[in-house]
Structures are given as structure tokens and as C-alpha cells.
Amino acid sequence: MTSFELNTAWYSLSAVLLLLCLSSVAAAEPPPVIDESMTSAVSNELELLKEEETVSIASRYEQPISQAPSNVYVITDEDIRQSGAIDLPTVLRRVPGLEIMQMTGGDFNVSARGGNQPFANKMLVMVDGRSIYGDVQGTVFWKSIPVTLPEIKRIEVLKGPASAMYGFNAFDGVINIITKSPEEMKGTTLQFGGGELGTISSAAVHAGTIGKFGYRLSIGRDQTQQWRDRDALGFRSNKFNLQTEYALSSTSKLQVSGGLVDTNRYDGQVGEVTSNSIRPSLAYANVLYEQGAFLIRAWWSGYTDNATITPNSQLVDLLSITDRNGQSTNPFSGNTYNVDVQHATNLWATHRLLYGATYRHNSLSSTTIDRFSREDRLGLFIQDEWRAASSLTIVAGLRYDLHTQITGTWSPRVAILYQPVEGHTFHLSGSAAYRPPTLFESHQDQRVTTTLPTGVPFPPSILSTVPISGSTRLAPEQIISYEAGYQGWYWKHRLRVRADLFFNHVSDLIGSRITSGGASEFVNDQGSADIYGGEAGIEFLASRWLSGFANYAYEEIGQSFSGTVKRGAPRSKVSAGLRTEWDNGLSGEISYYYVGATTYPIAQTFTTLATIPTTGVIAPGDRVDSYNLLNLRVGYRFWQQKAAAGYMRDAEVAVSVFNALNDEHKEHPLGDLIGSRSMGWVTVRF
């Protein structure tokens, strides 16, 4: 074991012992004398921890989580703060059934229930109901989320198909990042985190209200070095965000927001045979009007990039991937325009009807596609929530989506919720979803030049160039899902138990195939996959100062897919955590994650070139070993005071360690070796 590993292990052990000692001391020592307002604030926060969450992701309107017709999990702002994470995928690891794959210092893939892969494209991600999923390429830039971490109020995670509500791309599920209102974030919040690998996570947020007008302004800067080369920059971004809202009446409001994320270094994305270097800039503008149960939203998002397409390190001397002009650095420019309209109404005493429509226009310009491309989408949806009896609710929804590139699709969802006694709910559901081909998959136009050494003086090498093409004949990917589950409250709402079983049938996945003459083209794989399994977990509040969670997820995959569209996922995953927080300002969290060994498909390019002795290529193994991830955080809130405006001012310092055991591991055969990282944090709100 190296000195670095010894130091990291010793530091991790010391942090655990320190947290346990602090638990004993803080539990034993008498509480400090504090004013009544602080006591009231702590009491109110405790009561909130006992309450059932209200979510809006499942039905597009707010409802108790136990009444949601889909499987929903909530991550709070406290979960984010106490995690010590510098990015959201690290926080999302606690959600049972989600799969997180870190490829590099900048590149993450997030999916659910067996759907993860490089360039994962089957999870719809939104911020305040506005999609940040890049339709034109099927991409989510997880390190370039357009809000800072302190602005996030909660994250709602829906596992399973949700096209009945959200249309295309809600394939594996939906993640909605909900931000704090100007009233909730009133004042100025400054946060700075810095640590190993040149890591910086910083944010400055100012929010307030003036009469009926509210505003929130934020800036942020994030950066980190590469895992494989700790002296090389892996990611750096600057972000700006502004949200304003005006209360037109007690039941209506107008909201206008906009922002920009400029990423000047993004180590990734890692593809089947590439390890790219991209520099995406993401901008948006959003207008929302809400009047009671009626909502209309219009937004625009823009995407520009200059991406350098680089072959995998083993292939860099053998392959060259360029646009049709022979350039390996390619410009991209994409735009999305979207309008959503929805209305909910109560019919009689037992029905709640939701209906609405979505129109979207996408365009993409790049030298890597055959021409400037555009598409139009129109979706119409309706859902009825029928309270058939006091203990029985039936939810049925249907959506029809039109698309200029493919035939129309119908996406149904039916859910039955049975509550035999208060606090205990059983649910049974079935749904279907689609992911259409992206503009890039339909119109790709690139070239691959292969240089094969001969091993003789003349000719020293043989060159060949073949096209990589998209196809306008692609059908949408499809998933049909069935789920049964239970959630119940025990111990006076201090313990929640959840358990779910699922079965997914996946077909028509889009992948690249080598055709005659060595050319490559996107096609729909003729195979299919049946993915089934279950998840179980508990969340508990043991006392005012101790809470925790524990989850287990299991899945099996039977499939006839071939090539790189084959599904790969760990059979077993475990997540667990303990959190302590005391009146004297001390807090801490220990979270543990186990991910089982996994086999992922490797591109045929590697295996083909490995058979030619002169190339020196060794095909990567398709298996990644299991790994254990232990994350730690200890914090101390040394100042707290109630402001004249009614909110709490405070200041906190903290130390966090990612992968405290330094279990170096890969999460994909082509990914980097992930190590440990220690951070120091300062957060002030005034």
C-alpha cells in the first residue's frame, strides 16, 4: 500500500472515529442556551422531517407521495448539503434503482433499472419543469446543470416510463430539480468548496422580495482535475442564472427566468471508441404564467459546442474521426423552442381531470451532419384520477405524440392505488414510453480513416476511409413496464418502509452497426430485453439528532440484443447512510454504497483490431469489478441569528471526503480509475 493510500485510509478512519465521538459528546452535553425563535425553528424543522413529502412529478400537479401513480423518491436540500457532494449524480446514488456511472472527471451517465451506458439518453431531466435534456443529441450534461447547489430545494425522481405525462424521452424515468423561491432563499448565500484535484465548487446567490415582486440571482464556478492525470484540467464551468416572479393575485403568478452555463473544459464524453473533449455552452429563457390549476409555459434553450473527437487512447494512432471536411474539431449549434399548456379540474366529487398539450421545435447545425436539420413535435395528453372508494384510487392517462420524423405514438399509463389503512399504500401500474431518434442519429455524416501498420518497409501502412451515417428510417425505441409496490409509515411517522417489484420489456434500441464495405450506420436492433427486479428500503428518524436510510436493489437482464446496445447493469446495489445534527451546531453524515460487478458490451472495433498483430491493440475487458464507496462529511454551524426580514442568518464550515476508503475502481471498462477526494467548505447566509 502506498503512503498516499495509508494517509487516506488513516484520514478516513479518523473522520469516522471523530464523528462517533462527537455523537456521544453532543448527545450527552446539555443544550446551549438559545432564544425562543431558534428553538421554534428547530422544532418546526423536526416536524417537517416527520411529514410525508408533496410531489408534482408524477401527475404534473402537487399530491402526497403515497398518492402518486408512479414510483417517486425525493432528495431534499438537506440531503444535498449533508452529502458534501460537488455534483448531483453523487447525490443521486442514494436513490434505489438509479444507476450512476462516472466515466471521467466531467462525464457522468445516469439511468434507471438496467438502462445505463456511455452517452446515456433515456432519462428525462428537468429544472422546475423545464427540460434540460438535449433533444438534438440525446444528452444531459450533468456537470453543467444551470443552477448552483444551494439554490436547489428538492429533487424528485420518478423511476419507470412516464411518456403518458411528459412525452418522448421519459423512457427510464424523470428527474425534476426544483429550486427555491425568492422568499425561501431571501438574503445572500455564499458557498465555497475547495480541495484535492484542484476541485472548486462555488456559488453566490442573492434573493429577495419587493412587494409582490420576487427575484433570485446566482453565479457559480466549478472545476476539477482529471482522474487519470491529476495535473490536467478535467472540468471547468461558469454559470449565471436569474429568476423573477410577480404575484398577480393570491392564485396567479408570472415568472420569467434565464441563464447561461459556459463550460470551457469538459473531459468527455466517452463513447464506444472515443474519448472526446467538448466545450458546451448552454443558455435558456423561460416564461411561465400560472392561474390556479391552469398553466402555460414557453421556453427556449440553446446549445453551442466545439467538440474535438478523439479516439480511445489505444486507437489514437490507428483511427481518425472527422467531419465531411476532414476536421476533427467540429462545431455544433442546437436550438429548442417549447410551449406547454395544461389545466386540471375536479369533475363531480370523485374525479380529477388533467389535460394539456406540448409543442416543440428542434434544430441542429453542424459539420458532422448531412444538412441543417429540424423537427417538430406535438403532444396531447389527458389523465383522470378517480377516487373509486375511500381506500381505492384508479389513475388512467393517455398521450398521443406526433413527430415529423416518425409515425405518431400512443403512451398509456394505468395505476391502481389501494390504502387499506391510513399510512399504508399498495400500488400496481403499467405504462409504455418511447424515445425518438435524435437529429444527430438521423443525419450523422462523419468519416473514419483507419491506418493499419503492415510491419514491412513498403508500404508501411494501409489507409482506408469509410462513412459513418445516420438514418431517417429509424423507429422510436420502446419500453413497456409493469410495477407493484408498497410504502408504509411506522413508529409515529418516524420510519418509512418501501418495496417495489418491476418488469420492463425494451425493444427497438438504436445503435451503430457496421454495414457492407466497413461503413457504419444507425439502425434499430432487432432484439429485445426483459429486465426485472426489485428495490426495498427504509428511512428513519431515530431521534432529534439521528436519522438514516438503507436501500437494496436487485435486477436481472434477459436479452437478445447484440453489439453495444446490449444492456449491462450490476445485479445488486446497496446504499445506506446515517446523519447527525445537534443544537450546538455540529453535524455529520456517513453514506455507504456498494455496486456489484457488471459486464458491459465493448465495440467491435476493439476486438477486430486486436486480431491484427501489428496494431498492438489489446481489447479491453468487458467486466468491471464491484466497488465500495464511503463518503463522509462533518460540519459545524458556528453562527445563527434571525434576520429582521424573518429568515435565519448562519455560517458553517465543513470537511467532506468522497471515496474515503480510496477503493480505486472503474465504473465502465473505458472509464477512468476513480479515486478519493477531500474537500473543505464554507457557507454563509446573511
Regions found by a protein language model. Name each.
Residues 131-159:
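Short acidic/polar hinge/loop motifs at secondary-structure boundaries
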Residues 57, 64, 89-134:
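Extracytoplasmic beta-strand/coil segments of soluble accessory domains associated
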Residues 224-231, 235-237, 252-336, 367-368:
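Flexible loop and strand-edge segments within Gram-negative outer membrane beta-barrel domains
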Residues 295-309, 419, 427, 459-466, ...:
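Membrane-embedded beta-barrel scaffold of Gram-negative outer-membrane proteins
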Residues 2-4, 16-85, 89-95, 250, ...:
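N-terminal Sec signal peptide and the immediately downstream disordered periplasmic leader
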Residues 163-164, 176, 184, 193, ...:
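Periplasmic-side early beta-strands and strand-to-turn transitions of outer-membrane beta-barrels
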